[in-house]
Regions:
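Bacterial N-terminal signal peptides that target proteins for export
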Residues: 1-7
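A short, solvent-exposed beta-edge/loop patch
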Residues: 81-156
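Short, surface-exposed beta-edge/turn micro-motifs
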Residues: 12, 61-63, 123
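Bacterial N-terminal signal peptides
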Residues: 8-15
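Sec/Tat signal peptide C-region and signal peptidase I cleavage site
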Residues: 16-21
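Short, solvent-exposed recognition patches
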Residues: 22-109
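General helical structural elements
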Residues: 7-8, 57
Length: 156
């Protein structure tokens, strides 16, 4: 009986950890760097994972993608106020947008480039960062990644 309970608990924990079952996929036609994975462990137990991969689209747009899943991202809520930092902050700006039907925040910093943060699930956040991409290029790249991540999730 104890084994059945333990097995049921393990299956439930595995299913919960695979809520989005995401990884940063290899995209056909893109140059995809190696997937770097960091498990987020603490004294209190496993807290999630951090995945990183560099991409270059077929059009030559280079960006870094980061997928964080676990205890940290579930506390993240998109800000309700957006705007521009003005001259004193170096011209940074932030804007709420929608990417593939998900709430997102697009941040622009003149020296660092663009950062697009998309909340895909209760426990998962996808971030794309690029020094050279424009808004449309980064948004299209995010949409492509999200579509592929969701397709892989549906296959499982």
């Amino acid at each position: 009986m104890f084994r059945k309970i333990l097995l049921a608990a393990a299956i439930a924990a595995l299913a919960a950890s695979q809520a989005f079952a995401a990884t940063l996929p290899e995209v056909e036609g893109w140059a995809c760097g190696p997937l770097r994975e960091t498990q987020l462990d603490a004294v209190s137990g496993h807290q999630g994972q951090w995945l990183e991969r560099e991409y270059r689209t077929a059009n030559g747009v280079k960006f870094l993608a980061v997928w964080m899943e676990g205890a940290g991202p579930k506390l993240w809520k998109p800000v309700t106020e957006v705007g521009e930092g003005g001259e004193t902050s170096g011209g940074e700006s932030a804007e709420k947008i929608s990417v593939a039907g998900h709430g997102a925040m697009l941040e622009s910093r003149p020296v660092l480039g663009l950062s697009l943060v998309v909340k895909l699930s209760k426990d998962g956040v996808l971030t794309l960062e690029s020094q050279s991409a424009d808004r449309d290029e980064l948004t299209r790249a995010a949409e492509t990644l999200i579509e592929q991540m969701e397709a892989e999730k549906a296959e499982k």
